[in-house]
Amino acid sequence: MFALIYICAIVIGKIKFSGTEKQQPSSLVSETDNLKDSESNFVEEETERSTQKTAEEQEIILEKETTSESLQTETAESQQTDLVNQIDYALEKMTVEQKVAQLFIITPDALTGISGVSAAGDATYAALQQYPVGGLVYFENNLQSYEQISEMLHNVQQYSIEISGLPLFLAVDEEGGTVARISGQGYGIEPIEDMAAVGASGDYERAQEIGTYIGSYLSDLGFNVDFAPCADVLTNPANTVVARRSFGSDAALVAEITDLQRKAMEQEGIIGALKHFPGHGATSEDSHQGFAYIQKTEEELMNNEWIPFKKGIEEGAKMIMVGHIVCSEITGTEDPSSLSYYMVREILRQKMGFQGLVVTD
């Protein structure tokens, strides 16, 4: 480039005389044009090389990203295969009685035969040897202080792993608001407002914050399962069972909030259980006191009460709690959904596609 400018300057200088510019000879014009053409060709070649280099660099980056994604996929598949192999190996070693025991999540009181169990010691160890259950759920009479809860859960988890090689589901009902075994109970955990208030505010960010908060302190204590959030759509205004526990009567809002809260808990290491399928918000009775009834068709429920559950299933929910709720319009029987093959297998598993863990209320 500098050579071209220098030559052009000499040529122009030679054809000037007394301030008057003379006509350039044709030979000089031709030489200048040739130089310009050469420079233009050079620039085009450099641009082409640069473009080609950029394309090659982008291709290399893309190949690296593809390779990285492929390796991540292979690693995930390998880990999944290893996990399946471990499960198969564990099942092969178990007796029928041990396999049946793994299907139960019970209270520590039921496990040991002792009322108000608040520690995991020799009695708990002996009971787990005889009944290696799949999990334990804790209530107010088992909980006394932050330190006591933490030590109890740590010990019982260690016992289970030592005895069966399998960890326990350690569960609690911690919805926040009116149903809270930990927050607001004097363990240094601040209380949380009713979920009805959260739903009424429409504050998705607050719902997510609550999920993170609950998940954080439960995980710190040693729990790994929370029988929450409440995915019931409050479609019966006379319902008092979940009136303050439900996020509201708008199925779409309930679906979004429960999903956000569940995911937030899972980020903290807590499995959330969507409850109470097929929907306690449509009942008037309390299923803890007896059977509760839903007088709706399958289509009606699918288009309303089941929307939060469908959302959760699509988004990867790991656990759903089925209530003792009779849907005679669908099943033609008085069997509660918790014991109904049709409600669990035909609807929840097959029609709705849930492949996670189903637990009863």
Report the location of each language-model feature.
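Short glycine-enriched loops at secondary-structure junctions
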Residues: 109-112, 172-185, 224-234, 274-280
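Second-shell residues forming the walls of enzyme active-site clefts
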Residues: 95, 115-116, 120, 145-164, ...
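Short, acidic/polar
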Residues: 113-129, 207-214, 302-308
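A substrate-binding/cap region within the structured catalytic cores of diverse enzymes
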Residues: 193-223, 228-251, 258, 262, ...
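N-terminal hydrophobic targeting/anchoring segments and the immediately downstream early-domain regions
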Residues: 2-33, 39-46, 59-170, 174-184
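Second-shell loop/turn segments in exported
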Residues: 77, 89, 110-115, 135-145, ...
